[in-house]
């Protein structure tokens, strides 16, 4: 089997939901707020997992998601009976260079037209979401297209 080319740096992008809310970092928590002047949305760092052969096929591109320049990465962990989305201090390149996938930090990125979804690899069927209210922390949900928004626009920066 052919080895994938090694990547030195993650790609960068910005994310907003269908209501034009962007992700911002507030007290070590990611929240979605309406885009305004003089606001600084986070720049997302993302990089594909090098070990796709060990993951489910046809679910999307397995990626690590972090905050560019901040050594913070998104991860999923069970708190009580519920999977939760958390920010953990971690260098995204350290995750990328691990000898095996670090599933708690991986998301299946699926694209349909301009919309992207991010499904937890550790908790299949759970997706990154924002409350339709806005101004709330990002969460994980199993309920697509209901009270929470799971479709995002991902714009890659070059």
From Swiss-Prot:
Residues 1-5 form a propeptide. One of its GO terms (cellular component) is extracellular space. Induction: By Il-1 and TNF-alpha. Expressed in immune system and fetal brain, but not in other tissues tested or in multiple hematopoietic cell lines. Predominantly expressed in skin keratinocytes but not in fibroblasts, endothelial cells or melanocytes. Increased in lesional psoriasis skin. The keyword Signal does not apply. Gene3D superfamilies: 2.80.10.50. It comes from Homo sapiens. Keywords: Cytokine, Cytoplasm, Immunity, Inflammatory response, Innate immunity, Nitration, Secreted. Interacts with TMED10; the interaction mediates the translocation from the cytoplasm into the ERGIC (endoplasmic reticulum-Golgi intermediate compartment) and thereby secretion. Initial experiments using non-processed full-length protein found in vitro activity only in the ug range. The modification 3'-nitrotyrosine is found at residue 96. The keyword Secreted applies. Belongs to the IL-1 family. GO terms for biological process: cellular response to lipopolysaccharide; cytokine-mediated signaling pathway; immune response; inflammatory response; innate immune response; positive regulation of interleukin-6 production. The gene is IL36A. This is Interleukin-36 alpha. It is found in: Cytoplasm; Secreted. It comes from the Eukaryota. Cytokine that binds to and signals through the IL1RL2/IL-36R receptor which in turn activates NF-kappa-B and MAPK signaling pathways in target cells linked to a pro-inflammatory response. Part of the IL-36 signaling system that is thought to be present in epithelial barriers and to take part in local inflammatory response; similar to the IL-1 system with which it shares the coreceptor IL1RAP. Seems to be involved in skin inflammatory response by acting on keratinocytes, dendritic cells and indirectly on T-cells to drive tissue infiltration, cell maturation and cell proliferation. GO terms for molecular function: cytokine activity; interleukin-1 receptor binding. N-terminal truncation leads to a dramatic enhancement of its activity (>1000-fold).
């Amino acid at each position: 089997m052919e080895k994938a080319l090694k990547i030195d740096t993650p790609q960068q992008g910005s994310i907003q939901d269908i209501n034009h809310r962007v992700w911002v970092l507030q007290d070590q928590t990611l929240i979605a707020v309406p885009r305004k002047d003089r606001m600084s949305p986070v720049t997302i760092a993302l990089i594909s997992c090098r070990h796709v052969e060990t993951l489910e096929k046809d679910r999307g591109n397995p990626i690590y998601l972090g905050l560019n320049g901040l050594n913070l990465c998104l991860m999923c962990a069970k708190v009580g009976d519920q999977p939760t989305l958390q920010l953990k201090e971690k260098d995204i390149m350290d995750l990328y260079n691990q000898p095996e996938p670090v599933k708690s930090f991986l998301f299946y990125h699926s694209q349909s037209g301009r919309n992207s979804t991010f499904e937890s690899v550790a908790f299949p069927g759970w997706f990154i979401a924002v409350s339709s209210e806005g101004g709330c922390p990002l969460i994980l949900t199993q309920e697509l297209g209901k009270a929470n928004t799971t479709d995002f626009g991902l714009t890659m920066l070059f």
